[in-house]
Amino acid sequence: MAGARLFRFRDEPGPGADPTVLEVRVPQVLHVQYGMYVWPCAVVLAQYLWFHRRVLPGKAVLEIGAGVSLPGILAAKCGAKVTLSDSPELPHCLDICWQSCQMNNLPQVQIVGLTWGHISKDTLSLPPQDIILGSDVFFEPEDFESILATVYFLMQKNPKVQFWSTYQVRSADWSLEGLLYKWDMRCVHIPLESFDADKEDIAESTLPGRHTIEMLIISFAKDSS
């Protein structure tokens, strides 16, 4: 079992009331595979979930490229029906998903192998989702279309599904606009200050630091609601 890293999400109430605190522990491993440790985008996405935690109970939530699964674990602790997924070609990442569930006493969370852009038996068997999570999955430009193709497939099961994603700005030349148009999707940028994420230290973690993070909500363009 890997060492644990603790994240404490806090909601400061009005004067005289006790704060609401949620603790999440995830494995922390120094490993060449990206999914084996917490990236700055993950804590920002987890903060968005924490800020909107009252909408989560009973929702079907799928985290893609989950790795240590901080956002998905937080969603499960807030009452969502969570499935964690990562590449079946990266068994260490799937194992780290399992370790995260064990650390947080969440045996009900499902873990599946999912390859972006490929419709496997596991992908076909997924139930309709309400929310898809992805923190820093838009890392390699050659993966962008495969990610959106997978999201598009899931949108066919539930056209109202939303893809909540955080993205670390690494190049001004990278853009999703053309691919979103191709796959009939739209994107809304959510200001970090609207969910208390415009700071360098979230959940007592020293993350995201000084990195430039964007919060996106991607949905099916044909869903006018």
UniProtKB/Swiss-Prot annotation:
Q: Which domain of life is it from?
A: Eukaryota
Task: State which residue ranges cross the membrane.
Answer: none
Keyword Aminoacyl-tRNA synthetase (UniProt)? no
Q: Where would you find this protein in the cell?
A: Nucleus; Cytoplasm
Main location per UniProt? nucleus
Q: Name one GO cellular component term.
A: nucleus
Sorted alphabetically, the Gene Ontology BP terms of this entry are: cognition; epigenetic programing of male pronucleus; epigenetic programming in the zygotic pronuclei; epigenetic regulation of gene expression; methylation; positive regulation of transcription by RNA polymerase II
GO MF term (any one): protein-arginine omega-N asymmetric methyltransferase activity
Q: How does it assemble?
A: Interacts with HSPA5, HSP90B1, TUBULIN, UGGT1 and UGGT2. Interacts with TET3. Interacts with STPG4.
Specify the protein name. Answer: Histone-arginine methyltransferase METTL23
| Recorded name of the encoding gene | Mettl23
